[in-house]
Every structure is written in structure tokens, then in C-alpha cells.
From Swiss-Prot:
HAMAP family according to UniProt: PSII_PsbA_D1
Family: Belongs to the reaction center PufL/M/PsbA/D family.
Superkingdom of this protein's organism: Bacteria
Catalysis: reaction(s): 2 a plastoquinone + 4 hnu + 2 H2O = 2 a plastoquinol + O2
Quaternary assembly: PSII is composed of 1 copy each of membrane proteins PsbA, PsbB, PsbC, PsbD, PsbE, PsbF, PsbH, PsbI, PsbJ, PsbK, PsbL, PsbM, PsbT, PsbX, PsbY, PsbZ, Psb30/Ycf12, peripheral proteins PsbO, CyanoQ (PsbQ), PsbU, PsbV and a large number of cofactors. It forms dimeric complexes.
Membrane topology reported for the UniProt record: Multi-pass membrane protein
UniProt protein name: Photosystem II protein D1 1
Amino acids binding Fe cation: H215, H272
Positions that bind pheophytin a: Y126
Details of cofactor binding: The D1/D2 heterodimer binds P680, chlorophylls that are the primary electron donor of PSII, and subsequent electron acceptors. It shares a non-heme iron and each subunit binds pheophytin, quinone, additional chlorophylls, carotenoids and lipids. D1 provides most of the ligands for the Mn4-Ca-O5 cluster of the oxygen-evolving complex (OEC). There is also a Cl(-1) ion associated with D1 and D2, which is required for oxygen evolution. The PSII complex binds additional chlorophylls, carotenoids and specific lipids.
Binding, [CaMn4O5] cluster: D170, E189, H332, E333, D342, A344
Organism expressing this protein natively: Trichormus variabilis (strain ATCC 29413 / PCC 7937) (Anabaena variabilis)
Any Pfam family matching the protein: Photo_RC
Length: 360
């Protein structure tokens, strides 16, 4: 009898827990995906903050030249970053227990891998949580579909690119200047500016920003009610009012006259679908471009210059881009030392500037 009561009690407890996390009446929806999201997001956030502030230098290139990235090791908020896992680790999974000591784990950049993997699981769970809440409320699943664009972009630079290049050391650094460093180095190594998917991605991001600004300004400019001819149109709207007075016909008429008739939408659904689809598709293509370049399927390379009938080079944008790429790549090349650092940085030894005379 006691065993039966305990089983029923535990079953009721689990049932109550399931009802609570899936309830849409809570101030914040948790959901089953939230059970995975919360611990992984907290782990990634806590380790990132600790590493950003106090992580010791990391031997990112695997050549015994540690690179400091934290605030306590000489960086400011702009230059500080979480340095990627060492090239000596490659693509191996490197949890704390795989290292001989905590110092070794930190020296080889273990926190970077820990942050990235937990962060990716967290954003996948967040996307699943968006779908779960939409399902519970009877909504269509377009919100998680739109969120899949930044998820794909993060996956491309933090996971797909290191896999394609053979090491987590090639992943994007987790910091402001580290992000710019990743972008600048990516250009000469893969000629990203000449990749069509990158071009589509740029059009998606900047076009999405333009369309968002246009839409917001049009909506704000048509928040009016019908006024008489002796009243100003501005009297038809009170800031913070509860009722909606947006008039899509007015916005459509204004924009149609500003450009041409068919440049505007007279249907709210098609308008908002376009506003969502344009940047999402663009970012999908950008993520796909990064993923293809991860395996060295790079942008167009015009290695042979255009020559005139006398064999002289006709300089083009491709030549300028090639020279810039070569310059960036040379600056980024890893130093090859002939001596260990403790010998190379020791006291200067006197050397003979002339050969000694040889007695005959």
C-alpha cells in the first residue's frame, strides 16, 4: 500500500510539473524546450563572463605563443575576447576532465568550446521553444522559421567553419575586435566579397534594414483618424492611445505616388510576409555561403589579369581585391621562430662583424 501511494505521489508531482511548464498562463512560458534552454544558456553565459574577465592566455595556434584575451590580462572592453580552443586540440571534444589539470584546460582554450557548444544547444532550444509556444497558442510557426536565420548564421561561424577548417582554433572569437578579426581574415582566405551567396546576404541585411525603416515611418505617419478640413491631421492621433488608427490605404496611396503605383502593397499580409522573408532569406544565403567556404569552396578568383593587345595589365576591381587579400594574408601569417622563445628573448650576444684573420 505504501509503495502504491509513493508511485501515485511521484506521478502526480511529474504531472503537475508538466502542466506548469507547458501552461500559457505563466508570466514567462517555459515549455519542454525551456528545460533544455535554461541550464545550457546559463552555463554558456556564466563561463563566457568568467572567461571574458579573467581567462589566462591561450595557445590558440598551438605553437607555444599564448594569446591573452581577457580584461585582467591587459585588454579593454573592445579588445577583450574569448580566445578559441588551441589548434593542438583540433576538433577533439575537450571537456574539463579530458585535461590533466584545470591550468592545462585553460591554456588550451577549453572555455571557448564549452561556451560555443552550450550556446548552440541553447539557441536551438530557444527556437524549439518558440515553435512550442506558437503551437500551444494555435499560431502558425513562422516566428521560429524567421529565427532560424540567425541560428543558421551562428552555427555557420561557430561550428561548421571550424569543422571545415579542421580545428576549433579557426572559429570566430567571442568579442568585439575578435569578430572583426574573423571577418577581415575570412576575406583573403576565401575571397568572400566575390561569393554570390555573400552578396545575397548583404542585400538581405541592408535591404531588410531599409524596408523596416520605410515601413515604420509609413505606419507612424498614417496613425491618424479622419479629421475635418479645418483641423490639422496631427490632431487625429494622441501619443500612447490604445485604439488603432493605422490606415494602410493611406500608406499605400502615399508610397504609390512617391515612387509608382505597383511599388507599394495594398495587402497587409503580403506586405509583412515580404518584410519577414527578405532579410531571412538573405541571412540563410549568407550562412550557406559561410558553410560552403568552410570547405574551401571559395568566392570567384580572377587570378589572371586582363591584358591589352600589347600585353599590359588593365587594372580592374578584381586586381585591387587580389592585392588587398594578399596584403591581409601576409600580415596574418603565423610567425615561424627558429629558436625557442626563452632563447630568442634572452640577453643579446655579441657577434663578430668581420671574419678573423687566418694564420698561414
Amino acid at each position: 500500500m505504501t509503495t502504491l501511494l509513493e508511485q501515485r505521489s511521484s506521478a502526480n508531482l511529474w504531472h503537475r510539473f508538466g502542466n506548469w511548464i507547458t501552461s500559457t498562463e505563466n508570466r514567462m512560458y517555459v515549455g519542454w524546450f525551456g528545460v533544455l534552454l535554461i541550464p545550457t544558456a546559463l552555463t554558456a553565459a556564466i563561463v563566457f563572463i568568467l572567461a571574458f574577465i579573467a581567462a589566462p592566455p591561450v595557445d590558440v595556434d598551438g605553437i607555444r605563443e599564448p594569446v591573452s584575451g581577457s580584461l585582467l590580462y591587459g585588454n579593454n572592453i573592445i579588445t577583450a575576447t574569448v580566445v578559441p580552443t588551441s589548434a593542438a586540440i583540433g576538433l577533439h571534444l575537450y571537456p574539463i576532465w579530458e585535461a590533466a589539470s584545470l591550468d592545462e584546460w585553460l591554456y588550451n582554450g577549453g572555455p571557448y568550446q564549452m561556451i560555443v557548444l552550450h550556446f548552440l544547444i541553447a539557441i536551438y532550444a530557444y527556437m524549439g521553444r518558440q515553435w512550442e509556444l506558437s503551437y500551444r497558442l494555435g499560431m502558425r510557426p513562422w516566428i521560429p522559421v524567421a529565427f532560424s536565420a540567425p541560428v543558421a548564421a551562428a552555427t555557420a561561424v561557430l561550428l561548421i567553419y571550424p569543422i571545415g577548417q579542421g580545428s576549433f582554433s579557426d572559429g570566430m572569437m567571442l568579442g568585439i575586435s575578435g569578430t572583426f578579426n574573423f571577418m577581415i581574415v575570412f576575406s583573403p582566405e576565401h575571397n568572400i566579397l566575390m561569393h554570390p551567396f555573400h552578396m545575397i546576404g548583404v542585400a538581405g541585411v541592408f535591404g531588410g534594414a531599409l524596408f523596416s525603416a520605410m515601413h515604420g515611418s509609413l505606419v507612424t505617419s498614417t496613425l491618424v483618424r479622419e479629421t475635418s478640413e479645418v483641423e490639422s491631421a496631427n490632431t487625429g492621433y494622441k501619443f500612447g492611445q490604445e485604439e488603432e488608427t493605422y490606415n494602410i490605404v493611406a500608406a499605400h496611396g502615399y508610397f504609390g505616388r512617391l515612387i509608382f503605383q505597383y511599388a507599394s502593397f495594398n495587402n497587409s499580409r503580403s506586405l509583412h510576409f515580404f518584410l519577414a522573408a527578405w532579410p531571412v532569406i538573405g541571412i540563410w544565403f549568407a550562412a550557406l555561403g559561410i558553410s560552403t567556404m568552410s570547405f574551401n569552396l571559395n568566392g570567384f578568383n580572377f587570378n589572371n589579369s586582363i591584358l591589352d593587345h600589347q600585353g599590359r595589365t588593365i587594372d580592374t576591381w578584381a586586381d585591387l581585391l587580389n592585392r588587398a587579400n594578399l596584403g591581409i594574408e601576409v600580415m596574418h601569417e603565423r610567425n615561424a621562430h627558429n629558436f625557442p622563445l626563452d632563447l630568442a628573448s634572452g640577453e643579446v650576444q655579441p657577434i663578430a662583424l668581420a671574419a678573423p684573420a687566418i694564420a698561414s
